[in-house]
Swiss-Prot record:
Originating species: Drosophila pseudoobscura pseudoobscura (Fruit fly)
Disordered as annotated region, ranges: 194-217
CDD domains, sorted: AdoMet_MTases (cd02440)
CC per GO annotation: nucleus
Keyword Methyltransferase: yes
Function summary: RNA N6-methyltransferase that mediates N6-methylation of adenine of U6 small nuclear RNA (U6 snRNA).
GO annotation (BP), single: rRNA base methylation
Ligand binding (S-adenosyl-L-methionine): 85, 110, 133, 164, 186
Swiss-Prot/TrEMBL catalytic activity: adenosine in U6 snRNA + S-adenosyl-L-methionine = N(6)-methyladenosine in U6 snRNA + S-adenosyl-L-homocysteine + H(+)
Full protein name: U6 small nuclear RNA (adenine-(43)-N(6))-methyltransferase
Keyword Transferase: yes
Enzyme class: transferase
Length: 305
């Protein structure tokens, strides 16, 4: 069956960025964004997605325009693309909807300097978020982003004392025995042990064009021992020790070949309540997997097409 090319790379149906922003109007409205834009001969404003400074101002502007969030990023840190992060949040909304929860508590594993997932979850949905981060500079920026948006009542940024642990450090020190409804994670994609960690290709160039965006982020944010597969395997292992603390465990994956490896790892551990999805935004595709140790089947959510 041939898929409709028009919809092949479409975003989640509720993603506000399915309708492309009018960069010309936004450049008039936001001075800092205007200063990094390019003016075409037609008078239209264009955005150079391969320029890191431009991407930073674009992300900051879109967060302000669509969610009234005032966000800054640590120098050299990962610049989050809003469309992708929204796709992830919307997928979580879909899975949580059947539960009819009055209060939602989530964990953001590795929130980075932007703390974008926690900010979006809190601002958009009123979720209570625990943001875990191990890098000191990122922790400082994340806490400042929470403070400047007056979301301290909904978001706690927790400094991970040991980055080799996922939930362990927090759960061992947290006395209230809080239960969480989900965790999310954007793991380091690349294997730090590889001789060329950034040389891998996450796409099939014969079937899909290259992503437009320049790669951003520090080595610590982009690489870890064993890459994303090993990182998510650690989440799976810790999830088995915390079956009652988190209802739905999820993680994004940047490489399609990682998906069957994670599914096999879950199967080996007899975890069968599993669902997957794809996030499409422009020429970039990401994958995600969710699993639960509870008997209620996971909702697959709305697919991005």
């Amino acid at each position: 069956m041939v898929r409709n090319k028009k919809n092949k790379y479409a975003m989640h149906p509720r993603n506000i960025l399915r309708v492309p922003p009018d960069y010309t109007k936004l450049a008039i409205k936001y001075r800092d964004f205007r200063q990094v834009c390019e003016l075409e001969l037609t008078g239209k404003v264009s955005v150079n997605f391969r320029n890191e400074k431009t991407l930073r101002e674009l992300s900051k502007m879109l967060l302000k325009e669509y969610f009234e969030l005032d966000v800054d990023f640590a120098p050299g840190s990962l610049v989050p693309t809003l469309a992708l992060r929204l796709n992830y949040i919307l997928w979580l909304e879909d899975m949580l909807l059947p539960l009819n929860l009055e209060t939602v508590r989530g964990i953001d594993v590795g929130c980075g300097s932007s703390c974008i997932y926690s900010l979006l979850g809190a601002k958009k949905n009123g979720w209570n978020m625990l943001a875990l981060e191990s890098k000191e500079e990122n922790i400082d920026y994340a806490r400042e982003n929470v403070r400047r948006n007056n979301l301290e009542d909904l978001i706690e940024v927790y400094a991970q004392p040991d980055k080799s642990n996922i939930f362990k450090s927090y759960f061992e020190t947290e006395k209230l025995r809080k239960e969480f409804h989900f965790c999310l994670c954007n793991p380091p994609f690349f294997d730090s042990n590889s001789p060329n960690p950034f040389g891998g290709n996450t796409r099939n160039p014969q079937r899909r064009p290259a992503p437009n965006n320049v790669r951003t982020g520090s080595a610590e944010e982009l690489t870890c021992e064993g890459g994303e597969v090993h990182f998510v395997q650690r989440i799976i292992e810790e999830s088995q020790l915390n079956k009652q603390r988190v209802l739905i465990f999820t993680s994004m994956l940047g490489v399609k070949a990682s998906v069957p490896k994670i599914l096999d790892y879950l199967k080996e551990r007899q975890i069968t309540n599993v669902t997957t999805t794809e996030f499409h935004q422009g020429h970039t595709t990401r994958w995600a997997v969710a699993w639960s140790h509870q008997p209620t089947p996971l909702s697959p959510g709305t697919q991005c097409n």
